[in-house]
């Protein structure tokens, strides 16, 4: 939605990735009440997943310092959504503004914008919009930062795993947060247009894709060389670990890419349908919540990416027994005795062969 602030001296326009649907008040309250349990479950999944990733560190510290805050930034995203819900159910309200009739995603027509004379009562809504924009660009830039960190790790394979310096992760965090905050403010205040919005994430994806294939190619080559018994190069234990670490990160990243792309496709079709007014607004709630509830499927992919994470992740969720426990069937004593005799015979044969080999 757009907010157009008109004063005697100037006019300012703000863009927020927030939707308000023209629905009855009871429907808005009911939908908000239905969304909250899913957000609570998502928060629990995020907390558990971040704790497991820090407890069972499968990757280098630098990668964890860069990646884990990205997953934790979901709490900023949901904070923006909760502020929007407060406006939706009219806990936060502006009497002189019909805020609940603005659902246009992007427009240049002033009559489709929210026209106001002041920002009194709307500052929390601007904060919510900034948090959602900032989250999107943080994910984009931190993804590029993770790939770049793995490229540096591959180039410095001789001693990177032994380094404990925090210079690399701190530098990446400062750079990508500076870019995310700067672009988010530029888009919020409508300084950067739609072309810059699209060009920034498209460029990051292209650069990240090139780096991804570089990392996969060089580390696959090193793995094949390590497994070659006639190799001439000597790989240290730390170097072998780093190669497998890079390939493991690539495997998890590949799964995440497919899931994220599917989410973007669903949300993209929903936004297009909303702009063209070819769908019922009620169904847009489902498309919108594919973003806010993404931990329910993104983190499942991450946690199932490694057996150690998967095993630990299951401990935090109670087992639900749907079916009655099946009683074990009766086994004939004769069959058990035959199996024991067969196992004993094979064991005796093995030791006789071993004894004859030493004599």
Curated annotation (Swiss-Prot):
It is found in: Membrane. It is a multi-pass membrane protein. GO terms for cellular component: membrane. The chain crosses the membrane at residues 29-49, 66-86, 127-147, 172-192, 195-215, 256-276, 282-302. One of its GO terms (biological process) is sensory perception of chemical stimulus. Keywords: Membrane, Transmembrane, Transmembrane helix. Its main location: membrane. PANTHER family: SERPENTINE RECEPTOR, CLASS E (EPSILON)-RELATED (PTHR23128:SF60). This is Serpentine receptor class epsilon-26. It comes from Caenorhabditis elegans.
């Amino acid at each position: 939605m757009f907010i157009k602030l008109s004063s005697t001296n100037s006019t300012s326009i703000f863009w927020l990735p927030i939707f308000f649907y023209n629905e009855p008040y009871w429907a808005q309250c009911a939908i908000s009440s239905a969304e909250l349990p899913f957000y609570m479950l998502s928060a629990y999944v995020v907390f558990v997943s971040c704790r497991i990733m820090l407890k069972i560190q499968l990757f280098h510290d630098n990668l964890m310092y860069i990646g884990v805050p990205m997953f934790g930034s979901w709490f900023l995203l949901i904070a923006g959504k909760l502020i929007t819900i407060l406006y939706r159910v009219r806990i936060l309200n502006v009497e002189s503004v019909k805020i609940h009739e603005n659902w246009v995603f992007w427009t240049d027509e002033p009559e489709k914008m929210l026209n106001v004379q002041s920002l009194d009562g709307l500052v929390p809504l601007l904060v919510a919009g900034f948090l959602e924009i900032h989250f999107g660009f943080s994910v984009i830039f931190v993804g590029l930062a993770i790939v770049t960190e793995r490229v540096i790790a591959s180039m410095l394979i001789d001693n990177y795993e032994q380094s404990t310096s925090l210079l690399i992760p701190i530098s990446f965090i400062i750079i990508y947060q500076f870019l995310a905050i700067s672009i988010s403010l530029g888009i919020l205040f409508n300084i950067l247009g739609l072309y810059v919005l699209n060009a920034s994430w498209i460029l990051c994806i292209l650069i990240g894709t090139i780096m991804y294939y570089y990392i996969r190619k060089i580390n696959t080559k090193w793995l094949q060389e390590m497994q070659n018994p006639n190799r001439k190069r000597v790989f240290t234990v730390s170097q072998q670990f780093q190669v497998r670490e890079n390939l493991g990160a690539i495997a998890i990243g590949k799964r995440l890419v497919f899931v994220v792309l599917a989410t973007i496709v669903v949300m993209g079709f929903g936004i297009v349908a909303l702009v063209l007014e070819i769908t019922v607004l009620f169904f847009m709630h489902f498309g919108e919540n594919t973003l806010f509830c993404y931990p329910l499927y993104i983190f499942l992919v991450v946690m199932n990416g490694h057996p150690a994470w998967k095993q630990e992740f299951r401990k935090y969720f109670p087992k639900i027994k749907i079916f009655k426990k099946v009683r074990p069937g009766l086994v004939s004593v004769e069959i058990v005795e035959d199996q024991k005799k067969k196992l004993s015979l094979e064991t005796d044969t093995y030791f006789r062969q071993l004894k004859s080999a030493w004599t």
